[in-house]
Curated annotation (Swiss-Prot):
Positions of the UniProt region annotated as 3-dehydroquinase: 1054-1267
Listed Pfam families: DHQ_synthase, DHQS_C, DHquinase_I, EPSP_synthase, SDH_C, Shikimate_dh_N, SKI
Catalytic center residues: 258 (proton acceptor), 273 (proton acceptor), 819 (for epsp synthase activity), 1170 (proton acceptor), 1198 (schiff-base intermediate with substrate)
Record region (Shikimate dehydrogenase): 1280-1569
Enzyme Commission number, as recorded: 4.2.3.4, 2.5.1.19, 2.7.1.71, 4.2.1.10
Manner of cofactor binding, per the entry note: Binds 2 Zn(2+) ions per subunit.
Keyword hit for Transport: no
Record protein name field: Pentafunctional AROM polypeptide
Amino acid sequence: MAEAKKPGPERISILGEANIIVDHGLWLNFVVDDLLQNTPTSTYVLITDTNLFDTYVPAFQAQFEAAAEGKATRLLTYTIPPGEASKSRETKAEIEDWMLSQQCTRDTVIIALGGGVMGDMIGYVAATFMRGVRFVQVPTTLLAMVDSSIGGKTAIDTPMGKNLVGAFWQPKRIYIDLAFLETLPVREFINGMAEVVKTAAIWNETEFTVLEESAAHILECVRSKGEGRLTPIKDVLKRIVIGSAGVKAEVVSSDEREGGLRNLLNFGHSIGHAIEAILTPQLLHGEAVAIGMVKEAELARYLGVLRPGAVARLVKCIASYDLPTSIHDKRVVKLTAGKKCPVDVLLQKMGVDKKNDGQKKKIVLLSAIGKCHEPRASVVDDKTIRTILSPSIQVTPGVPSNLDVTVTPPGSKSISNRALVLAALGLGSCRIKNLLHSDDTEYMLSAIHQLGGASYSWQDAGEVLVVDGKGGNLQASKEALYLGNAGTASRFLTTVVALCSPSESASSTILTGNARMKVRPIGPLVDALRSNGVEIEYQGKENSLPLRVDAAGGLKGGVIELAATVSSQYVSSILMAAPYAKNPVTLRLVGGKPISQPYIDMTISMMASFGVHVTASSDEPNTYHIPQGQYQNPSEYIIESDASSATYPLAIAAITGTTCTIPNIGSKSLQGDARFAVDVLQPMGCTVNQSDYSTTVTGPAPGELKGLPHVDMEPMTDAFLTASVLAAVASGKTQITGIANQRVKECNRIAAMKDQLAKFGVQCNELDDGIEVLGKGQDGGISAPTVGIHCYDDHRVAMSFSVLAVASPSPVIVTERECVGKTWPGWWDILSQAFKVDMIGHEPDANADEEDSKSSVMERSVFIIGMRGAGKTTAGNWMAKMLGWKFIDLDQELERRAGCTIPEMIRGSRGWEGFRADELSLLKDVMAKNSHGHIFSCGGGLVETPEARQLLKDYGRNGGNVLLIHRDTEQVVEYLMRDKTRPAYTSEIREVYLRRKDFYQECSNLLYYSPHSESSGSKSEIPCDFQQFVSSISGRSTHLKDVMEKDHSFFVSLTVPDVSEAASLIPEVVVGSDAVELRVDLLQDRSVDSVTRQVSILRALAKKPIVFTLRTVSQGGKFPDEAYEEGLELYRLALRMGMEYVDVEMTLPENIIQTVTESRGHSRIIASHHDPQGTMSWKNASWIPFYNRALQFGDIIKLVGVARSSEDNFDLAKFKSRMQEAQKTPMIAMNMGKAGKLSRVLNKFLTPVSHPALPFKAAPGQMSAAEIRRGLALLGDLDPCNFYLFGKPISASRSPALHNTLFGQTGLPHQYHRLETDNIQDVREVLQAPDFGGASVTIPLKLDVMGQVDELSEAARTIGAVNTVVPIGKADASDRRRLLGDNTDWRGMVHALRDEGVEEQADSETKGAAMVVGSGGTTRAAIFALHSLGFGPIYIAARNQAKVDALAADFPAEYQLQGLSQPSDADKVSSNLNVVISTIPADRPIDPSLQELVGALLSRPAVGTERRVLLEMAYKPSHTPIMQLADEAGNWTTVPGLEVLASQGWYQFELWTGITPLYRDARSAVLGL
C-alpha cells in the first residue's frame, strides 16, 4: 500500500502570487531548498538579532552549506541588538556600510529573520540598497506573522514618530514557520494577539467569536512551561495565523499602496501609534494598538455608529488575552514608570499619521464586530477625539428647547449581576438580553469564568450573552479574583466561592480589589459565613477585602443569622448560594430593619425565575426559608434597564423643562429606584406619566422646581444623588433621609455631595442618615464652579453632576470621565446624541497631576516597641517634636487611667495577668481612637501577649508604622540594673531579651538602632542620625529633589570592611558628597545584627543619606550571585532602617525585585545594571532591555558599562540624552575603566566617587569628587566664580586663607579676594557681576549691604546685620541671580559653644541662663545665638542702660532679655548662669563698673554639673581682659574669638557651595596650622 503523502505547507496568495507560505517546521525543512530553487542569487544576507542568532542561525547555516555545495552562492550573516531602538537611521546605515564592505551587489537577497522591527527595517534596507534588492521575510513573532511581514510596508522610526521614513517594498517570499512561536516569550505572544483581534474585529465576526472562545485555552498553553507547550493549540494557532494573514493579503492585493481599503488594517493604530510614540520602547506595539482599539471603538460609539454592546465585547476580548485596555492599566503604568500621555501630544502625534488628509485626521470606525463603518478610514474632528482621549470633560450648559427624547438606559447593574450568578449556578443554557456592559459585570463575568462555573458566548452582534451553567460545579482558583471597585460582585462572590470544590492547584480563593475596595465593609457577611462553617481569612484590613475563602463545597446550612442594616447585598449573596448548602437554610436578618428591602425582594423574585422558590417565615419577621435545589436556567432572561441610571436622563428633563421617556421601566419594575419619578420628581413639580412598563417626565420651566421638605429615599438610596442635584436648583430646603448606607459605597457619597455642591454655592447639612440641601432656586440660582468637580471614581457622582452642569451658568468640568463605565459606559454619548449637550475633553494641569502623584508623607500613628531602657520614651519625644505630633507613653497612660503605678497593679489581686490584660485593652483603644498624628511608646513586655503581637502586625501590614527601638544589649542591661522605677525582672535580663527578640522583629516594620548610650548626649537635643531616620521613614526627606536640582551631585563609595574601625575616616571621606554608599558586599561580617550596627554607626558619623548596596560578583562586587535569601534579608533590613536609597540589581529574580520595591516605603530604589565585562555597547539597543526593566522598578536608574576608548563615552552621552528626553526618571550612566573617566565627569547626577583616604576604589576608573570638579572646570562645565570680603580694615583678615584653602581641597575653581572699602558704592558693581559667587561682609558695611540684596534670612532680619551675601536660584535673562543676605556670626558662636559641650536647653523651668557683655552690633548676633540654644533669661551687661533698654526692645518678649549696668545688678541674675559671650572691644580697658559686675558674676560658685563657658568674640589680643577675669574666677572654660571666625566662615562656605568641609580644615586655615 502506498504511503500517504504528507500535505504540503499552506500557501496564501498576495498580489497574484502565492508567496506567503505557512506551516510548522519550515525554517529547517523547507526554506533552504525553496530559496535556492525559487530565489537564486550569488549572495544571501541573513540578518537577525542577537537573541535569535544562536538558536536559529547555526543549524540553518549548516543546512545551507550542505545544500549549496558546488553552487556559486554564499550566505553572509549579521546581527543587531533586539528591540524598537534598533529601528533607526543609525542601524540602517551600519548594515548598509557592512554590506558594501562585503561587496554585496544588485543580485543580493536579504533575509530578515525576526519580529516586526527586523522586517520593517531590513525591508527598508532592501528597498534602498543598490536602489532595491530582493528580500525575504521570516517572521518569528506572532505579530510579524499576521501583520508586519505582509504587505510590503518597510520603515524606520524617527524622533517625530514611528515608521515615518520608509518605502513600499514587497518581499519575494514570506515564510511563516509556526514552530518559532514555541520559543516566543509570553508577553511577545500576547503582543501579537492584538493584531489578530484587530483583523477579526474589522473583517470577520465568526473568527472573532473563535478568538473569544479560545482565549482561556490559548493563554493557558502560552503560559505553561516546557517543550511542546503550544502542541494542544497547534490547529487553533494555524487557523488564527492563516485567517489573519489571509485577510491582510486580500486587503493588500486590493489596495497595495493604501489608497483606502488598506486603511482598515490600521484600526486601533491611529490612536495606538500616538500612544506608542510616547511610551515606546517600554510599551510594545500590540499593547499600544490594544489600547488604541478600545479608544477608537469608544469614538465610534460616541459618534453613534457602534452599539455599546459591541464596544464591551471588543474590550472583553482584548482583556481576555491579557492585553491592556487603558493607558491607566496597572501594568502599563508600571512598565512606563507612570509616564503621562498628554492629549495635546497625542493629537500632535496623530497629526503626522500617513492616513490623514492634510489637517483632517482619519480613523477607522467600526459599525459592528467584523464590520467597518466605511470601506476606508473616516474623517473625525479634533474636538471629538479630544473628548474620548481626555480624563475629564467640560460640559456646556443648555439643551435645545422643546426637546422630547426617548432614552433606553443599559441593563440594571443589580439585575445583571444577579442574573450572571444565577445562570452560572444554574444548569443549562440561558440567553441573557440587555445585560449591562460595564466594569462591574465584566469583573463578575471574568470571576465566574475563572472559577469554571460557566462558559459563555455572544450572539446577535454582542447584544445577547449565552451562558452555559454547570449547575454549581465550581473550582477554587489559584489566581486571585480581582474585582476593582465592584462592590456588588465582591459581596455576591464571597458566598459563591464558598461553594467551590478544591482544585488541583488551589484549596481556597482570594478575592481582592482596588484601594477603595479594601476599605469597603464586608464584615457582617463574613461573620455570617464563618458561623456557618466557612473558613474565611482577612488578608489585610479587618472587615474588608482582600479575603481568602476556603473551598468549602457549600455552606453547612441550617439557621444563618445576618446583620442586614448596612447592605442588602449581604442578604442577596447568601440567598442566591443557599440552595447549594448541605442542608436547607433558614436566613434570619438581625440587628434592626433591613436596608433596601426592595433589593431583597428582587433577588427572591429572580430566584423564582430560575426555579428556586424562597418563602418568608409566617411567624418570624425578616426570616426566609430557602430549600435545597439546583437552579434550572430559563431559555431566555431579559434584564430590564437600570432604574438608578434612568434617574439621570429623567433629571435632565426635570432640570431643563424638557421631556424624556424611559420605554422599559414602569410601575411593575423589580427595582426600587423605579419609584423615583413618582415619589421625587412629581412632588418637585414635574409632570410624570408612568405605566406598567414605561415612564415619561416633563420638567417645569427652568428655575421652577420645588424643594421637598422631607423625602425618605430608603427604598431607592442610590438615587439620592440625583435628587440632591435637583434640590440644589429647587426653591426651598430639601431633606433626604434613609440613606445612611451611602456613606460606605464607592465613596462617602453624602460627604461627596455636600463638598461638591458647595462648589456651586449650595449649602448642605449632613444628617445622621441623610442630607439637607438648601436650594438656590429663589436666590438667583447656583453659581458656576471655579474648579473641576471631583468624582471620587464614583459613577453616580459623575453622572449626577453632569445633570447639574446642564443647568450651570457656565461650563463645568467633571473629572474622572471614565468612571461612568461602571454602570453606563455610553452616558456621555447619550448626553451628546440624545440631549444635544455640547461637550469637549479637558485635561487637568500637568503640574496638578504631579502634585497629586507625590507619595504621601506619614500620617498614621507610630507605635514604638523595644526593651525597657532602649530609649523608647526619649526617641518618642524626639519624633513627636519633629513631626509636630502628640507623644503618649502607654505605661504612663495606663497608670493615669488606673490611678496607681504599674508595680502597684502587679502587686494587686489581678497580678501580672491583669496588668497584661489592661495593657492590651489600652493598645486596642488607642489604635481605634488615635490612629493618626500620635507617637505611642509601648511597654517592653507588650509583645509577650499573643493578641497584642497580632494587633501590631496587622497595624503594620495595613499601612501603620511599628518602630522597634534598640541599642547595644550590654548598655540596656547596665541601665536596667540601675532602674528602680519599674518591676524587677524575674529572670535574667539577657534571657528576657532573647525571648522577645523575634517577637520585636515580627511585630515591627521599622527599626532604629541607636548608636548613642543612655548617658550620652542631651535628651532634649535630637541627634542628627535620628533626624535623618525620621525624615526618611516619614516621607519628609527632600534629598532626591534637592540633588536633582543641583548641577552636580555625588555619593562616595565606602570600601571599608568595618565601618566602626574606619570611624575616624568617615567624616573626611564624605566631604563634598551628597550621600554615602555602604557597600554591604565588602563588609567582613554581613550578618543582620552586624550590618544593623554598621548602618547605625555610619549614619551617626557621616550625617548623610545612605545608599545601601549589595553588589553581586557578576556585577563587579563580592556578594555571591545566588545567595538570594541572604540578600533579601539584608534588603528587608535596609528598608526597615529607612535607608534613603537602596540599590537593587535588575538581574535579580523577579520575586526579590518585586518584594523589595513593593515594601520600600519611602526609600528610593536605584535600579542598577553593571556590565563589568564590557559585552554591551551604548551605540546600539543592547542596553534598552535593562533600561526598560530599571524604569519599571526604579526611582533612579543606574547603568554602568566599560569604555574601551573615548568614543564609548560619547555614545553613552547620546544614549543618556535620548532616554532623558523620553523619561523623567533620573539616571546615573557611566563607563568603568581609565577610558571611562570622562563619563564620570559628564554624569553630573549622583556620580559614585572615591576618596584618597579610602583603602581602594569601588570600581575601575573611579575618581574623587574633587578630581571630577577639576575636570568639569577644565571642560568649561563648572564656571570659576569670584568671592569677596567687603569692609575696612581687612588686610589682616584670615578669611581669604580659609576660603581659598577650602576651594582648593574640594576641587572648585573659585577665588576669594579682599575688597577693602568703607563705601557701599564700591561693591555694587561686584554684586551684579555674572561671575559673583558670594561675599563676606564686615564692618562698617554690615548694615549698608542690607539695601543691596533681594531678600534677607530670618537671622539677618532679627540681628539687623548681614555678614554673608549668597546668590540664589538660576540666573535671569540678564545673567543676574537673586541675592540673599544672611548672618552666620550667630552660627559660628553656636558651633564654638557646642564644641565646648554646651547643649541645647530643654524647654523647662530648669533651663540655663546666659549673658552677653556689650551692646553693639555683635551683641545682637550673640543674643540670637543664645536664644537658638534655648537659654533664658538672657542678660545684657553694658555700661549704658539706655542702649541696653533700646536693644532689648528690638527683640520679642520670648527672648527674656534683662539689662545689667551696675555692680549691684548682679543680685538680679539667676544662679544657673552657665554661658557668657563677650562682644566688647579687647584693645581698650573695660569700664570699671562693668568689669566689677562681670567679675562678680564670673566668680560665683558653679551650680550643678553643667559646664560654664565664656566665649570671647575679640581675637586680638589672643588673651583678653574678660578671658583673664574668667581664668581668675576659675571653673570657666574660655573660647577665643578665632574659633568663631573659623566656624562662621565654615558656614559661609557651605551656603555658597553646598559642600560641608571638615571643620578642622577650616580651623587650621584660620589659625595657620
